[in-house]
Amino acid sequence: MDEKGILVAISGGSCSGKTTVAEMIYQLLSKKLKVAIICQDNYYKSYKNKPLLKRKTINFDHPDAFDWKLLRSHIEDLLNGSIVNVPLYDYINYTRAKKTAKIGPIDVVILEGLMPWFDEKLSRLSKLKIFIETNGEERLIRRIERDWQRGRNIDSIIKQWREIVAPMYEIFVEKMKRNADLILPWSQRREVSTSVLDVAIEHLFHKTVEKNN
């Protein structure tokens, strides 16, 4: 595949700060290149044929919850210079929304989520893999604040954390560090300047384009 763009992947536990880092990089890069952020959550399987109560019990922190085939296809299309209609996730109804977001053509795709390079093909396509490391206590506090704003009650948030989120982090998400190019502790995010990442990603993009021309 002659890539016209590059993929940067950002992994980390729930509420570790992945989106924040992705947006910081976007703000710098988008001044020079066409950049898009894609959230891996948008590629949860639809589960639209299951009733809402059943959808609420699904383990969304397990790799099997994602539509890897669709995600791979869309990433490959974007790296090829095409336009894709990215699905959007409805956090209230635990399924895909009816609307989609049109993205492309782009130079840099930032894919952020729990395990964006769990899939071998996506791992190979990723030019830079960044893992955001944040302690569990901080992540839980952020999770409670976030899900409370989404209308969840405290008991259900903590129950889900204990039974699903924390165990899945240990089994799957934390292992993403093994193949990460950069492990970024949240507490040191300001020492590891995003401007450095900006320069590195821009260099990777131009290097990839030159190689394929």
Swiss-Prot record:
This is Uridine kinase. HAMAP family: Uridine_kinase. Belongs to the uridine kinase family. Pathway: Pyrimidine metabolism; CTP biosynthesis via salvage pathway; CTP from cytidine: step 1/3; Pyrimidine metabolism; UMP biosynthesis via salvage pathway; UMP from uridine: step 1/1. Pfam families: PRK. ATP binds at G12, G13, S14, C15, S16, G17, K18, T19. One of its GO terms (molecular function) is cytidine kinase activity. The gene is udk. Gene3D superfamilies: P-loop containing nucleotide triphosphate hydrolases (3.40.50.300). It comes from the Bacteria. It comes from Mycoplasma genitalium (strain ATCC 33530 / DSM 19775 / NCTC 10195 / G37). Its main location: cytoplasm. Its EC number is 2.7.1.48.
